[in-house]
């Protein structure tokens, strides 16, 4: 691998060539830029490699930026832009012009026609950068899209299909997950993941890598268990019942703690399989109480627990801890406990960004994490030289025994600097810390602006003003990243921006980012950190002896290079722990990632296929093979097929009646027999849908295949998540948890594929059965809401017209106007379906006393409206009968009377269902999964 030095030397030559083309570019008229862009596109289309166009494309974009924005890219910016094009991370100091730098590789790679994504950490930066650079791209003849939250799908699709798309990291990931849940290819918004340029790459690819993106749905209620676990956590004696690993922030029960837990929950064995869930909830409750602090990891606002980004201090909107930890914190804070949701789709940032054909990024600090970038993303970190030398003075740390002493000295120094007039930026590690310092500043009578997770609305505005004379700005970590703090000449003459850090951060690069807010573009400046033995980092890593010796200092402090090195070593150790944690998340997610990619690829092929018979046949082979296995028995020590039993299970159900006799199955190799059975299944299925137009069959097949896919994939990731949550217990059995997880998750995935195949084959065998010799009444038609809605929409019928007379009249009219035989056949089938619906409604009337109501909300609302009932929940059976009799008296024709009778029968049946549910709602029943997927036991509330 080439060194930074050799890469910079090579890229410097590229940059010199680009600069040498400036006179030639100056000669171009404005309208020539789009023409030149098209020429470059044509050359790529004709086989020229995009790498060979770096010099020409960058020279063209540089001149365009100069004309539109008045900005002439420096050589170092061009070097940074070349680093990005070749798929690496460019470390560029604050103020070196990353926004302009990203313009060049975006333009060059957009010429391939495959799209470029420029990823930012928030929507403000996406909007700002798209507006600034969008003017340049417009001159170049390149389209720009802006993606954001709550945008309608058509606008999202338009944004993603632009040559260059600006978007936030979270929305980009969620759009990917949502795209892989659609049932119609037209509903997808993204195209291929070609090239991503990530602004603040360390924040996105490192800091947020531990928290996966999750789309949830459905819910399961364990509120009482969360409350019980929280009550137990409150009774725990911190010294006797638990051990807290301060380095990893894990909590473990001691022997006395385990005994207390067994007594509290009346359990004989805390580690028994059936108690895995409650043990997991206990540990979550202990974490919530003893390692998570309000104002540090999360904040409570308007009765909701909101996560705080540990590296930026921003609120992580829409994000929540998984595996029940969010609910444990809600129980601790006495706010409403949300019902735990089922994970419908999930992916980590690590695995998402590895899907891109090429990945690059920019940030002010990433070199300290280069090992992680190489191992996880296969990207190097190349440090760009600054345009002007850095003259900022980074003063040695002040170290104190107590926090109070550190803050007392900090306030003294702030007063001194403020009297001179230098602007001051105070960086803190948490909301709690910033609010503590705010109280000290207020007490000292100092005016200041504050940005933290509770006060982030004016973030960019406050940061942009932080370079004014006498300004004091208090911010959590790197709030305001992406917004420059610009200084007037007067402030520069005073010595520039002064940065004070209150305690060291978990990672050295975060400290460097804070320092880097001062001294941009060769400006003067100064930085210093105030450390105390009561800081979180010191509590976790400094020895008790060292902490005790510092307490003797009182209000005094020391400046020691030895101690500064010790702090740096502690940070390195913590960086290693955090990397291990992220690597651990990735190791487990890699298993799911392989399965997810396989599922999504097959799902995509189903969405785009013009014919699904090949897919269906594969499912039928799987089902046939499983049926052969299920119908085999051990006879004289050998597994032998019970041919009669197999024949009985498929004859007339999955294959044509009398298609096989038992002897056809004798002496056949299993896979050959499975293929033979699958071919017969496919023949049988094709015969059943032979009279239905191909487009209707394809739509029906696609809908049912995707429904089964999504149902069992959702179930798979939910079970895999629970499996992962408890897998660490394998350590106690001297097993490797990851190896066990791989084995069990693979077995689970194989079963999931079998479940999907089984359901698809079963559902398709029952959808529509047509026999031309049978009359309408004897045809068996399964009617779905989608089919009915499509027919109503295409024919102009309404739900009020669902009677034999209106249906026949409408279809006679439409058939008379039909242009071809295929349309006539389609209309005839639709007529049969609608007449079948009338029969189903009549049957429902006749059997409403012992049938459940399976109508949708709209149909039920219509029935209630017919009888004039507002709310069935507050209505008695007698009132329903009374309303029915009133309406029947007012009815003027048989059609209206018929509807009133149907409405009465349906509403009474629904009323009886509700009463039954109310009666049984409190009973709990243990349900063991019928599919035997590893003995998962769930508590299900009846009703």
Curated annotation (Swiss-Prot):
CDD domains: DEXDc_SecA, SF2_C_secA. The keyword Transmembrane helix does not apply. One of its GO terms (biological process) is protein transport by the Sec complex. It comes from Mesoplasma florum (strain ATCC 33453 / NBRC 100688 / NCTC 11704 / L1) (Acholeplasma florum). This is Protein translocase subunit SecA. Monomer and homodimer. Part of the essential Sec protein translocation apparatus which comprises SecA, SecYEG and auxiliary proteins SecDF. Other proteins may also be involved. Its EC number is 7.4.2.8. Gene3D superfamilies: Helical scaffold and wing domains of SecA, P-loop containing nucleotide triphosphate hydrolases, SecA, preprotein cross-linking domain. Part of the Sec protein translocase complex. Interacts with the SecYEG preprotein conducting channel. Has a central role in coupling the hydrolysis of ATP to the transfer of proteins into and across the cell membrane, serving as an ATP-driven molecular motor driving the stepwise translocation of polypeptide chains across the membrane. It is a peripheral membrane protein. InterPro entries: Helicase_ATP-bd (IPR014001), Helicase_C-like (IPR001650), P-loop_NTPase (IPR027417), SecA (IPR000185), SecA_DEAD (IPR011115), SecA_motor_DEAD (IPR014018), SecA_preprotein_X-link_dom (IPR011130), SecA_SF2_C (IPR044722). One of its GO terms (molecular function) is ATP binding. PANTHER family: CHLOROPLAST PROTEIN-TRANSPORTING ATPASE, SECA INNER MEMBRANE COMPONENT OF SEC PROTEIN SECRETION SYSTEM. SMART domains: SecA_DEAD, SecA_PP_bind. ATP binds at residues 77, 95-99, 484. Coiled coil: none annotated. Belongs to the SecA family. Its main location: membrane.
């Amino acid at each position: 691998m080439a060194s930074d030095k050799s890469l910079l030397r090579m890229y410097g030559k590229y940059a010199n060539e680009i600069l040498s083309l400036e006179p030639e570019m100056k000669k171009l008229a404005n309208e020539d830029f789009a023409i030149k862009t098209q020429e470059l596109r044509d050359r790529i289309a004709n086989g020229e490699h995009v790498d060979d166009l770096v010099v020409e494309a960058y020279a063209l974009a540089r001149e365009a930026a100069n004309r539109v924005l008045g900005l002439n890219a420096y050589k170092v910016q061009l070097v940074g832009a070349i680093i990005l094009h070749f798929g690496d991370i460019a470390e560029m100091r604050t103020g070196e012009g990353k926004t302009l730098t990203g313009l060049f590789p975006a333009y060059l790679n957009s010429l391939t026609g495959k799209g470029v994504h420029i990823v930012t950490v928030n929507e403000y930066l996406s909007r700002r950068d798209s507006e600034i650079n969008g003017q340049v791209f417009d001159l170049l003849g390149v389209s720009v899209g802006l993606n954001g939250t709550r945008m309608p799908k058509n606008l999202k699709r338009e944004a993603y299909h632009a040559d260059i798309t600006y978007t936030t990291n979270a929305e980009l990931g969620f759009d990917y997950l949502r795209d892989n849940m659609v049932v119609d290819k037209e509903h997808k918004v993204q195209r291929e993941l070609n090239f991503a340029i990530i602004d603040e790459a360390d924040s996105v690819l490192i800091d947020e890598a531990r928290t996966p993106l999750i789309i949830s749905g459905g819910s399961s209620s364990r509120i009482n268990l969360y409350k019980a676990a929280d009550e137990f956590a409150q009774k725990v004696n911190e010294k006797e019942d638990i051990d807290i690993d301060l380095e990893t922030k894990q909590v473990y029960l001691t022997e006395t703690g385990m005994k207390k837990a067994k007594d509290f929950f009346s359990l004989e064995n805390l580690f028994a399989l059936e108690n895995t869930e409650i043990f997991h909830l206990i540990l979550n409750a202990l974490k919530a109480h003893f390692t998570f602090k309000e104002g540090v990891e999360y904040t409570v606002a308007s009765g909701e627990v909101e996560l705080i980004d540990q590296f930026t201090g921003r609120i992580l909107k829409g994000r929540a801890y998984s595996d029940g930890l969010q609910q444990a914190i809600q129980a601790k804070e006495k706010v409403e406990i949300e019902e735990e949701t089922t994970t419908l789709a999930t992916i980590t940032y690590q695995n998402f960004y590895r899907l891109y054909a090429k990945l690059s990024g920019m940030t002010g600090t990433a070199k300290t994490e280069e090992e992680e970038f190489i191992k996880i993303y296969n990207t190097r970190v190349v440090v760009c030289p600054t345009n002007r030398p850095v003259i900022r003075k980074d003063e040695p740390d002040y170290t104190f025994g107590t926090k109070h002493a550190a803050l007392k000295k900090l306030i003294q120094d702030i007063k001194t600097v403020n009297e001179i007039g230098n602007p001051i930026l105070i960086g803190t590690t948490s909301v709690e810390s910033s609010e503590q310092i705010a109280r000290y500043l207020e007490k000292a009578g100092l005016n200041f602006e504050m940005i933290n997770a509770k006060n982030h609305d004016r973030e960019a505005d406050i940061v942009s003003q932080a370079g004014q004379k006498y300004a004091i700005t208090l911010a959590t970590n790197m709030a305001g990243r992406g917004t420059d703090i610009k200084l007037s000449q007067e402030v520069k003459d005073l010595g520039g921006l002064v940065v004070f850090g209150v305690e060291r951060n978990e990672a050295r690069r975060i400290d460097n980012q804070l320092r880097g807010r001062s001294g941009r573009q060769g400006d003067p400046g100064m930085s210093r950190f105030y450390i105390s033995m009561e800081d979180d980092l010191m509590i976790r890593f400094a020895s008790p002896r060292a902490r005790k010796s510092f307490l003797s200092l009182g209000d005094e402090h020391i400046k020691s290079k030895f101690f500064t090195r010790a702090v740096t070593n502690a940070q390195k150790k913590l960086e290693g722990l955090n990397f291990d944690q992220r690597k651990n998340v990735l190791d487990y997610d890699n298993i799911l990632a392989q399965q997810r990619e396989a599922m999504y690829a097959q799902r995509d092929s189903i969405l785009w296929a013009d014919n699904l018979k090949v897919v269906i046949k594969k499912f039928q082979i799987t089902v046939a093979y499983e049926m052969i296995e299920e119908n085999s028995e051990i006879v004289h020590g050998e597994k032998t097929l019970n041919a009669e039993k197999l024949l009985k299970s498929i004859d007339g159900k999955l294959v044509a009646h009398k298609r096989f006799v038992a002897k056809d199955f004798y002496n056949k190799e299993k896979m050959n027999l499975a293929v033979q059975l699958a071919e017969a299944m496919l023949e049988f299925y094709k015969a059943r849908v032979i009279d239905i137009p191909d487009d209707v069959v394809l739509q029906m097949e696609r809908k049912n295949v995707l429904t089964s896919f999504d149902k069992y994939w959702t179930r798979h990731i939910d079970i895999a998540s629970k499996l992962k949550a408890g897998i660490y217990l394998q350590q106690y059995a001297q097993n490797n948890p990851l190896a066990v997880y791989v084995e069990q998750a693979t077995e689970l995935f194989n079963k999931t594929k079998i479940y999907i195949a089984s359901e698809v084959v079963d559902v398709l065998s029952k959808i529509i059965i047509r026999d031309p010799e049978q009359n309408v009444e004897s045809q068996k038609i399964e009617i779905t809401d989608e089919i009915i809605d499509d027919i109503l929409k295409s024919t102009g019928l309404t739900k009020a017209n669902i009677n034999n007379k209106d249906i026949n009249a409408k279809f006679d009219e439409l058939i008379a106007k039909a242009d071809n035989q295929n349309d006539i056949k389609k209309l005839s089938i639709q007529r049969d379906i609608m007449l079948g619906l009338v029969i189903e409604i009549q049957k429902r009337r006749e059997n409403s006393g012992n049938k459940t109501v399976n109508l949708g909300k709209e149909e039920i609302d219509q029935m209630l409206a017919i009888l004039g009932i507002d709310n069935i929940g507050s209505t008695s059976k007698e009132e329903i009968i009374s309303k029915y009799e009133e309406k029947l008296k007012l009815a003027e024709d048989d059609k209206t009377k018929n509807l009133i009778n149907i409405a009465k029968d349906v509403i009474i049946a629904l009323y009886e269902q509700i009463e039954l549910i109310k009666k049984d709602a409190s009973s709990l029943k243990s349900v063991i999964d019928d599919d035997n997927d590893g003995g998962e036991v769930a508590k299900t509330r009846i009703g």
